[in-house]
Regions:
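Active-site-adjacent structural elements that line small-molecule/cofactor binding pockets in enzymes
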Residues: 1-293
Length: 293
């Protein structure tokens, strides 16, 4: 029997099922904390597209799927919890203004006493980029520069920066976080893996514990070694689904990921039939129990 005790369990905020009542969101966050869950994940989509459009719309989410804005929701959750950590999974960084995200993330880090991590991705939905007035086709290249700019803003009181996509003319944000905000990257494109190895504090795979995931990890380890960066302390967050699972499947999945060096396992409890806050908490508890037995 492998020891799954060291694997930190995170929970995915049930974005489309929690509703809009702040007392329900508070009860959920406090319930997750009471279960001893290490982190809460919040997904990010700013706009939902109307599928009734020329050429149709292919994508997992449309205008009828609710997404709570992660940074403002985490600021609220920070105020009603004490230990629960938080990670955006993943914020679509290139469709947002870099300096503003740096400012907001710093604020959440301060309000939560450094319980916040920024998970970032590049997204896939052109409708959101258009609505947010950001360029879609250079989003990967911009993301790398965005992270560099944010780290400068978090650390320095005056920046004179000219990049390919950013110009900061002797300015910075205030207040700044008292500790570095960890940045984790989601995705598996080769350029993204290079970026994660070079700039990331962790990786968020969007796949199963398979050969492709192992190849991604090997690639990042090699890249970090080349750059003289340690792989110790580099986090890996995979995700399990409550829906369609049972104790055996969850344990098998967790062990497969643990064998690959995964540090954090997040469980998503939505899309498993209608339920309420208590129901979501019971699902998390059931998943936890399966891994502890």
């Amino acid at each position: 029997q492998m020891d799954l005790q060291n694997m930190q369990i995170r929970a995915a905020f049930p974005h489309n099922e929690i509703g809009t009542d702040p007392s329900a969101i508070k009860a959920y966050a406090q319930g997750v904390e009471a279960l001893g869950i290490s982190h809460l994940l919040i997904y990010d989509h700013v706009l939902g597209a109307d599928p009734d459009r020329e050429g149709g719309f292919r994508g997992p989410y449309d205008k009828d799927v609710a997404f709570h804005e992660p940074l403002t929701t985490f600021a609220f959750i920070a105020g009603v919890t004490e230990k629960l950590e938080m990670i955006t999974t993943v914020m679509i960084l290139p469709q947002r203004q870099t300096v503003l995200v740096a400012k907001q993330a710093a604020q959440v880090a301060l309000l939560s006493n450094n319980r916040f991590r920024l998970g970032v991705g590049v997204g896939w939905n052109q409708v959101e980029y258009t609505g947010l007035n950001e360029t879609f086709n250079n989003r990967g290249r911009r993301q790398a520069e965005q992270v560099e700019v944010m780290r400068k803003l978090w650390n320095e009181d005056s920046i004179d920066y000219t990049g390919e996509y950013h110009r900061i003319d002797k300015a910075s944000i205030n207040p700044r976080p008292s500790k570095p905000i960890p940045v984790w990257f989601g995705g598996s494109a080769p350029a993204l893996l290079d970026r994660t190895a070079r700039l990331g504090d962790g990786w968020i795979p969007l796949m199963g514990a398979n050969e492709k995931a192992q190849a991604c990890l090997d690639h990042m380890k090699a890249k970090r070694e080349e750059a003289g960066l340690s792989f110790d302390g580099f986090g890996i967050q995979s995700q399990a689904q409550y829906a369609g699972g049972d104790a055996d499947r969850w344990v098998k999945h967790a062990k497969a990921w643990q064998n690959m060096g995964c540090t954090h396992l997040a469980v998503a409890t939505h899309n498993a039939g209608e339920t309420n806050v208590d129901g979501h908490l019971k699902r998390i508890e059931e998943y936890q129990r399966a891994l502890q037995e």
